[in-house]
């Protein structure tokens, strides 16, 4: 594993037209909605996530995402050095829907697995939004850092153990 980067990004990975097509496909074909107990909780056992999350299997969405899997493996190999498994067709992809009317947000958390047989090394995010206000993506690795590069269309990879949050959408 490389310690050089906390995150890696590619701006304009998807165009506005592609983002709209992908979002609409997920909204119309999602297989489930994330359960409340699957998200990070605070010390009072309340959800830190105030957003709706649609789930879709990788096998159902991968053709719409072009070379995403190859890109992720390549960027990982050159910037992080994790040994990643190929994407599984039954693995769930998440679409977090942040609503400005509800001031949607996701408080400080890190990504992890509750499994005894696999773990999570790398988190991959694609910003499928159109322009918006608020909803800043931040990481904390010794100090808080707003990832200004995470704009609509950006592909972002980061080490899953790094604390991160999404500020309220306004």
Pin down the residues of each PLM region.
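Residue-level preference for beta-strand/loop junctions
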Residues: 87, 104, 118-120, 158
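Acidic, glycine-rich loop-and-strand cores that form catalytic or ligand-binding grooves
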Residues: 82-89, 93-99, 128
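Histidine-centered catalytic micro-motifs
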Residues: 105-113
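Short, conserved beta-strand element in jelly-roll/cupin
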Residues: 97-100, 114-133
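Catalytic core of Fe(II)/2-oxoglutarate
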Residues: 120, 131-170
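Non-heme Fe(II)/2-oxoglutarate
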Residues: 1-87
């Amino acid at each position: 594993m490389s310690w050089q980067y906390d995150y890696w990004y590619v701006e304009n990975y998807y165009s506005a037209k592609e983002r709209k097509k992908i979002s609409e496909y997920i909204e119309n074909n999602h297989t489930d909605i994330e359960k409340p107990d699957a998200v990070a909780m605070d010390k009072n056992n309340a959800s830190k996530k105030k957003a709706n999350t649609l789930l879709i299997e990788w096998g159902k969405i991968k053709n719409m995402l072009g070379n995403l899997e190859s890109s992720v493996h390549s960027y990982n190999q050159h910037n992080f050095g994790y040994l990643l498994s190929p994407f599984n067709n039954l693995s769930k992809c998440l679409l977090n829907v942040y609503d400005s009317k509800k001031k949607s947000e996701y408080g400080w958390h890190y990504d992890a697995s509750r499994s005894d047989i696999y773990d999570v090394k790398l988190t991959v995010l694609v910003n499928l939004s159109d322009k918006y206000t608020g909803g800043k993506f931040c990481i904390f690795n010794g100090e808080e850092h707003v990832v200004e590069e995470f704009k609509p269309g950006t592909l972002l990879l980061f080490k899953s153990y790094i604390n991160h949050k999404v500020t309220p959408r306004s």
